[in-house]
Regions:
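Long, charged, mostly alpha-helical binding arms that flank functional sites
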Residues: 97
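Short linear interaction motif-like sites in intrinsically disordered regions of transcription factors
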Residues: 4-6, 119, 157
Length: 178
């Protein structure tokens, strides 16, 4: 399967990175995060999430393996046992996070706990797409050289994740005070 999305009425497959300065803004006074994505970005994210849900349920796409890393690198039998024990729980957690994102995608602000579900989904999407693009931790993108829509999407998800971490940082400060 391939990632797809469309914006606008012309039906063309395209992707536009949002012009908004910060996609998320932490509100420590309310223990919430403000979602500042424009409608097109929310539509793109929602479309990706729907495709991701289908991929998870189908469970045949090899790029999903990045979401379930092996616990035992040198013992496939132990790793299979571990996978049998945890796979269904991990899948359930991912599907529940998708549910949260889908239910809150159009809200202006969400509770921090719901935002952590957003972060999990965005990170999972980034990992799966990165696997498909054969991206490694050593890779650096030259923004002037990105012509592939999937690369643009990967970078956008990485930026969203970075901004999500920054926006939720106040929760770590509160945690460290206790």
């Amino acid at each position: 399967s391939t990632w797809s999305w469309s914006l606008g009425n012309n039906g063309k497959r395209q992707f536009i990175m949002s012009e908004i300065v910060h996609a998320f803004l932490g509100r420590p006074d309310l223990k919430q995060v403000e979602i500042r994505l424009d409608n097109e970005s929310r539509e793109v994210l929602l479309g990706l999430v729907k495709q991701f849900r289908s991929m998870l349920i189908d469970d045949s796409d090899q790029s999903l393996q990045r979401l379930y890393p092996p616990a035992y690198l040198k013992d496939s039998e132990l790793n299979d046992e571990y996978d049998d024990l945890v796979h269904d729980d991990l899948l359930k957690e991912k599907l529940e996070s998708i549910d949260v994102l889908e239910k809150t995608i159009w809200l202006e602000s969400i509770e921090l706990e719901d935002f952590f579900a957003w972060m999990q989904v965005i990170n999972s999407l980034r990992l799966v797409l990165g696997t498909r693009l054969n991206v490694s931790e050593e890779d650096e993108f030259d923004f002037g050289q990105i012509h592939n829509p999937e690369q643009t999407l990967f970078v956008w998800l990485a930026v969203l994740l970075e901004e999500a971490v920054i926006a939720s940082n106040f929760s770590l400060e509160d945690f460290n005070k206790t």
